[in-house]
Amino acid sequence: MAEPSLVAAGEEPEERAIEAALRPKNLDDFVGQHRVRKQLSLVLKASRMRGRSADHVLFSGPPGLGKTTLAMIVAAEMNAPLRISSGPAIQHAGDLAAILSSLSEGEVLFLDEIHRMSRPAEEMLYMAMEDFRVDIVVGKGAGATAIPLELPPFTLVGATTRAGLLPGPLRDRFGFTGHLEFYSVPELELVLRRSAGLLDLKVNSAGFSEIAGRSRGTPRIANRLLRRVRDWALVHGVDQIDARSASAALDMYEVDKKGLDRLDRSVLEALITKFGGGPVGLSTLAIAVGEETETVETVAEPFLVREGLLGRTPRGRIAMAPAWTHLGYAIPAGVFGQEQLDLFDRETGAEVTGEWAPESQ
């Protein structure tokens, strides 16, 4: 079983209180996601001007980018109470009916992991979202009757990491859909500056940059790394965190310059040293690193593929040229991805230009 990772995007239970304290409370304080913020701000402002509940909202994107925070901001901006539940908790239509029937007018219902809701509950949600009404079935068999239950107008905010699993009829009932993207390093630095202020930490610009560069483009990870660097600084008597102290702290936690942790590096090391860069089957690779197949596939692979370090092919997994370079190995001829590296000077990083020649006929 994989040990807990500092760079896993999922939220740990013990982090929830700290995360809640660091969450922005309004759109003005929310850093990043400029396009989604601008569009959402307009939707909410128009709803307030009309004096009506906001349209139903769906946020999609990888974990840790702010979907839950934005749901809370929707409720705050609409000055409405917030009810929180999740897809896995709603396994029967009756579970959903109980929640919907207790909503007050204008209330915001947040359903996290909405794609994991049961199909009967999804079908009940269609009518609730569109007509603010549900049919409660009483009895069984031929004697069963449907009793209509009117609902007060409410706003549903759904969040999903797998929008493709949502049925089309459900997606179509959301009046606004916002897809959240990974953050740039400068955006993460802004997130860290805000969090450091709330935590009363002294961090210079180089320190913020060092932490942001290892945060995988994810604010949740950035805040987690900041707290671990804070612990290191406290124990070592460091008053102001700079690049050197941040690097020393994160090196101790085995989070490298690219944000790779022990498992990530183990996967790449095994690919290169045991299988010559691949291709190798997923199950064989998992055995080589001493982890479950699902752990390698769901925990390590997404980030490695996104960073261009690992490739998936019909014949198996392969180590891309940047993986060889990152781990300090010489790249053998024919490694996939080497062509992209050869466009740049390996020492200076400057683009290599040459005289263009037409292909031979």
Curated annotation (Swiss-Prot):
GO cellular component: cytoplasm; Holliday junction resolvase complex
A GO molecular function held by the record: ATP binding
Gene Ontology BP terms: DNA recombination; DNA repair
Superkingdom, natural source: Bacteria
Binding-site residues for Mg(2+), renumbered to this chain: 68
Residues reported to bind ATP: 22-23, 64, 67-69, 130-132, 173, 183, 220
Catalytic activity: ATP + H2O = ADP + phosphate + H(+)
EC number per UniProt: 3.6.4.-
Primary location: cytoplasm
Keywords recorded for this protein, A-Z: ATP-binding, Cytoplasm, DNA damage, DNA recombination, DNA repair, DNA-binding, Hydrolase, Nucleotide-binding
Subcellular location: Cytoplasm
Function (record text): The RuvA-RuvB-RuvC complex processes Holliday junction (HJ) DNA during genetic recombination and DNA repair, while the RuvA-RuvB complex plays an important role in the rescue of blocked DNA replication forks via replication fork reversal (RFR). RuvA specifically binds to HJ cruciform DNA, conferring on it an open structure. The RuvB hexamer acts as an ATP-dependent pump, pulling dsDNA into and through the RuvAB complex. RuvB forms 2 homohexamers on either side of HJ DNA bound by 1 or 2 RuvA tetramers; 4 subunits per hexamer contact DNA at a time.
Subunit structure: Homohexamer. Forms an RuvA(8)-RuvB(12)-Holliday junction (HJ) complex. HJ DNA is sandwiched between 2 RuvA tetramers; dsDNA enters through RuvA and exits via RuvB. An RuvB hexamer assembles on each DNA strand where it exits the tetramer. Each RuvB hexamer is contacted by two RuvA subunits (via domain III) on 2 adjacent RuvB subunits; this complex drives branch migration. In the full resolvosome a probable DNA-RuvA(4)-RuvB(12)-RuvC(2) complex forms which resolves the HJ.
Name under which the protein is recorded: Holliday junction branch migration complex subunit RuvB
Organism: Pseudarthrobacter chlorophenolicus (strain ATCC 700700 / DSM 12829 / CIP 107037 / JCM 12360 / KCTC 9906 / NCIMB 13794 / A6)
